[in-house]
UniProtKB/Swiss-Prot annotation:
Belongs to the iron/manganese superoxide dismutase family. Its EC number is 1.15.1.1. The keyword Oxidoreductase applies. Destroys superoxide anion radicals which are normally produced within the cells and which are toxic to biological systems. Keywords: Manganese, Metal-binding, Oxidoreductase, Periplasm, Signal. This is Superoxide dismutase [Mn]. Binds 1 Mn(2+) ion per subunit. The lineage of its organism: Bacteria, Pseudomonadati, Pseudomonadota, Gammaproteobacteria, Moraxellales. Coiled coil: none annotated. It is found in: Periplasm. The gene is sodA.
Length: 228
């Protein structure tokens, strides 16, 4: 074997090893059983939404690592904050992976939802007038999002709370988001999130959502956000 051929084979092997060693984004297990959110969200919807839709976002995002090797060293939150550097596939699937991971953690069985903390209620009252007024504004954002997208409660850079919505799989962490902030609560209003149970009745899905909001997690996120 000539030295040049041997060198080529070594470099090729090194490249293969390097590619196979790239870290992949992982889909975390659901923090509850797929039937835990019934009757608000039915088991079949959860199985398809988590097991097929969310999984597809993770798989498709990992497929982009070959195009952008630096992704294997980028965590999911950091990816959102620099999403404009990447192509549409990374934006859609990276956003989809983050949004769904965030969404699952935003939900809990009705006996484990908790309540908004006094500190959060105080800020909600200051920025929206009351908890009910906040929910109404959030409902309007969710129902008013044309087509597919998300509704969000965020902490803005100036420390105030705001309700916003994003199209497709965008989110407020993205550097190209029209309204930026740290998300505390998000609602998926893509049809795949509710159509099996609610068909075209998005308003009924939004109403049911409030019975499974994980306020314990929202409180935790708020406490972290105001420290920054």
């Amino acid at each position: 074997m000539t030295r040049s051929l041997k060198t080529t084979l070594i470099l090729l092997a090194s490249s293969v090893i390097s590619m196979s060693a790239l870290a992949e984004f992982k889909q975390a297990p659901l923090p509850y059983a797929t039937n835990a959110l019934q009757p608000a969200i039915d088991q079949q919807t959860m199985e398809i939404h988590y097991g097929k839709h969310h999984k597809a976002y993770v798989d498709n995002l990992n497929a982009q690592i070959k195009t952008y090797p630096e992704l294997d060293k980028t965590d999911l939150i950091q990816l959102q904050k620099q999403i404009s550097k990447y192509n549409t596939a990374v934006r859609n699937n990276g956003g989809g992976h983050f949004n769904h991971t965030f969404f699952w953690e935003s939900l809990a069985a009705t006996n484990k939802t908790g309540q908004p903390s006094p500190a959060l209620v105080k800020q909600i009252t200051q920025d929206f007038g009351s908890l009910d007024a906040f929910k109404q504004k959030f409902n309007e954002a969710a129902s008013g999002r044309f087509g597919s997208g998300w509704a969000w409660l965020i902490v803005t850079p100036n420390g105030k709370l705001a309700v916003t919505s994003t199209p497709n799989q965008d989110n407020p962490l993205m550097d190209l988001s029209e309204t930026k902030g740290t998300p505390l609560l998000g609602l998926d209003v893509w049809e795949h999130a509710y159509y099996l149970k609610y068909q075209n009745r998005r308003a009924d899905y939004i109403k049911a959502f409030w019975s499974v909001v994980n306020w314990n997690k929202v409180n935790e996120r708020y406490n972290e956000a105001i420290k920054k």
